[in-house]
Amino acid sequence: MTALGAEEIRTRVESDFSRIVDVLNQKIALQSISAKGITADHMKRSAQFVADLLREVGVDTKVVQSHNPDGTPGAWEVIGSKNVSEDAPTVLLYAHHDVQPVPDPNVWNTDPFVGTEIDTRLYGRGAADDGGGIA
C-alpha cells in the first residue's frame, strides 16, 4: 500500500464530496441518541451503518454491545481491523457514533436530525462530533 500525499487526499475528497455529504446526512438522520432511559435501537442502527461504511473500504468489522459496570446492556460499538502489511505500523482510529439528546429543540434554527446546509456548512446533531469524521 502506497502512502497518499496531502494533494492526493484533497483531490479524492473533492471528487467524492457529494457522496461524503450524503453519508453524513444519512448518519445525522439515524438519531443515534445515547442516554439513560432511551432505547438502544437507534444506536444499534448507527453502529451497523458505520460497520457497513467500513466494510465498503475493506475493513473487517463486527458490531457488539458493551455492558455497563452494573451488568446492564451498554452502547453498541463497532470493532474493525484491516491488515495491509505485516511490517506496517499499527494505527488506531477512534470515534464515537452517538449523540446526546437535544435538550430544547426550540433553540435550533433547523431540525437537529436533518442535515441542513447553510452558507457551505452542514448543520445537524452530530455533524461535526463525530459524524463528519465518520463520513
Where do the model's predicted regions map?
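Acidic/His- and Gly-rich active-site-bordering loop/insert found
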Residues: 2-127
